[in-house]
Each structure stands twice: as structure tokens, then as C-alpha cells.
Amino acid sequence: MIVEPTVATYNTSDFRKGLKVQIDGEPYLITEMNFVKPGKGNAMYKCKMKNLIRGTTLDRTYKGGDSLEAADVETTTVQFLYRQGQDYVFMDGTTFEQYEVPNEVAGDIWKYLKDGTECSMTLYNGAAIIVEPPQHVQLEVTECGPGTKGDTATNVTKPAMVETGAEFNVPGFIKEGNIIKINTLNNEYVERVNN
């Protein structure tokens, strides 16, 4: 007797923001979900979803009792090792498996990556589809113009290059050699870590 593997499904009552589902053979993330109960008729669930591979969005409406297949995605913590041409090489610290991630998937993550940076990686059928840096990273300032005397009391900013080659706007008192904390969600300076 051959036993087929069961595929997890989500009923409409399980739908919520952040749920990963499969539609037409591709993984989607529910980004918005609204429950609508009209005066007459059955309840409906209006969902806005993002395709995790292509980045496109999709709007769908489901009736109560409908179900969707769970996406076969796995999220794991990986460490950045090095760049190889246009690819980024990461390693899973638990299994020691290495993943080569193309530039198209990695996007502008290079701004925050130095050796050993831990990132979150989402895999679909064993291939990386999303790589996210930690919310905050600490980077050394390698190049910036001199601050003007008295700038510590005002909101004067200047561009500063960090060890990854990225440029961020920092307060006027930041100097070369300072370690700064950057918020990767909005790409902004948070604070100076050392003097």
C-alpha cells in the first residue's frame, strides 16, 4: 500500500497576516486580511497576498469554509560567509549547509553584510527566496567628512561610508573609526556605539 504524504491546509478561520500559503504552485504571504460579514449571505475573507518569489501582489476573496494549501517554506538562521561573483554565500550554523544566493534575491542586503552577520533565510523547495538582515547592525565608519564645530546641538547630518561600502547619513559628530548602529528596516542611523 502506497501512502501519499498529506499536505497541510489552512481553513479560512486560520487566515491571518503573516501566514504563508500556496496558490497555483507558488508561495504567497498574506499581508492583509479582512473579515467581511454582509447583511445577507455568508461571511467572506478578503486577502491581500505577496508572491514570495516574484514580489507581485494578489487580491483574493474567500468564502467561509474555503481552504488553502500551506506553502512548503522553511525559515532558518544563516551566517554570511563571503561574496562569490554576483552571489552571496551563507551557511546554516546547525546543518553547515551552504547556500549561494543570487544578487536578484539578496537585493540591497550587501549594505549590512560583513563576515559572520546572522540573517534570516526563507527557503522554498530548498532554494533561498528571501534573505533578511537583522533589524540592527553595527558597522565601522571608514570615511566621512569633518564635522563642523558646534554641530552637536543641531540636526546637521553628513554622509558617511561604512566598512561594507554603503553610505548612510549620520550626525555631524560622527568620525572615522566610530562604530554606528544602523536600522535595516528604514536604512537609518540609530546611535553611535563607541566614541
Curated annotation (Swiss-Prot):
Pathway: Protein biosynthesis; polypeptide chain elongation. It comes from Rhodopirellula baltica (strain DSM 10527 / NCIMB 13988 / SH1). Pfam families: EFP (PF01132), EFP_N (PF08207), Elong-fact-P_C (PF09285). Involved in peptide bond synthesis. Stimulates efficient translation and peptide-bond synthesis on native or reconstituted 70S ribosomes in vitro. Probably functions indirectly by altering the affinity of the ribosome for aminoacyl-tRNA, thus increasing their reactivity as acceptors for peptidyl transferase. Belongs to the elongation factor P family. Its main location: cytoplasm. SMART domains: EFP (SM01185), Elong-fact-P_C (SM00841). GO terms for molecular function: translation elongation factor activity. Keywords: Cytoplasm, Elongation factor, Protein biosynthesis. It is found in: Cytoplasm. This is Elongation factor P. The gene is efp. The keyword Cytoplasm applies.
